[in-house]
Amino acid sequence: EKTMAKTLFDTKIDIVDLEFPNKGVGYFGEENKKVTVKNTIPGQTVIADVKKKRKNFEGRLRSIEKKAEYEIEPACKNFGLCGGCTYQNISYEQELEFKKNVVLKLLDNAGLTNYEYCGIKPSPSITAYRNKMEFSFGDDGLDGNLCLGMRKRESNYEVVTADCCNIVNEDICKALSTVLEYFRGTDEQFYHRMRHTGSLRHLLVRRGHFTGEMIINLVTTSELKTDLKPLVDNLLALELDGKIVGISHIVNDGVADVVKADEMNILYGQDFIMDKCLGLNFKISTFSFFQTNSSGAEVLYSTVKEFAGTSNDKVIFDLYCGTGTITQLLSENAKKVIGIEIVEEAVEAAKINTELNGIKN
């Protein structure tokens, strides 16, 4: 065991299994010790640096020596470098098979046996499906170019520009490129979490999957000096499939790397979009919770309604109901539906959505 006090560099590992959340499992050494390596899949042979953490061994992926036979060419040019996606190098059917096995293994390990496995209902959309994205400002290396996108894999600081992201509508990519181009022409720097310098933090974009309505939220510190009026004009001049209905500037002077608002100023339009789910209308504000895969959410909620059944004398409680999406969708299944939520803003949004949909019970 003393030999594992330090890292075993460049260890060759055959990946044979998967563990939750995206950890490949292999074995190494004469004693055939188990090791997990993030972002690997069964069938790959990888080179990793292995280190003991508590009672387990973890490997940091260095390179993939041999691909799995079933791997495909990723649709996104940034896959492998960008930390946003995990399984673009396999088919969606293979991804679902992996996830099925992982879930069943978790249930087995927990000793749960008295259940009926009903299979997986796939998402109707597997590209351009996300209705919300939080992008980070940063650089592509030490003192590198200003970037706006997702964190690099295995990095807490470096950023990959997501100007052609495969999981969002092209409208969102156009907005990102416009914002990045604008600030590259200024003296503004990204907010450095360790030095606490710079002003540019995040770009939060929401786009209604069924309506095409879009709100764009720029998040900076209060140190921002650049006039934002030209940026607003540039965004509104974009040729989009949908329509920008709101642009806001959010001020966040906190040290944590999260999107929150100390102050919010609407620069154009409004701070919400409207979208639909199973025929109902929903007002979705900047910080509202709403399932990020809209078409997948319809499959999910239809299944919930099916499992709940219909009864004229039934009272349904929706715990942790958020903005009341499921609560309202279940209203036609019961005499009365009661949503329970601790976040006051979400409760107020739920009340507004209930009025929009004319729901009385």
Language model features with spans:
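Internal alpha/beta scaffold segment
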Residues: 157-201, 222-248, 255
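Rossmann-like S-adenosyl-L-methionine
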Residues: 1-12, 18-24, 225-361
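Terminal RNA-binding accessory module
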Residues: 1-78, 153
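Short, aliphatic-rich beta-strand segments
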Residues: 205, 212-221, 281-285
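Short, conserved phosphate/pyrophosphate- and ester-handling motifs at nucleotide-, phospho-/glycolipid
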Residues: 43, 168, 293
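Extended interfacial segments that mediate partner engagement and assembly in macromolecular machines
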Residues: 62-74, 80-190, 210
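Short, acidic/hydrophobic/Gly-rich beta-strand patch recurrent on exposed beta strands
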Residues: 24-29, 149-153, 217-219, 350
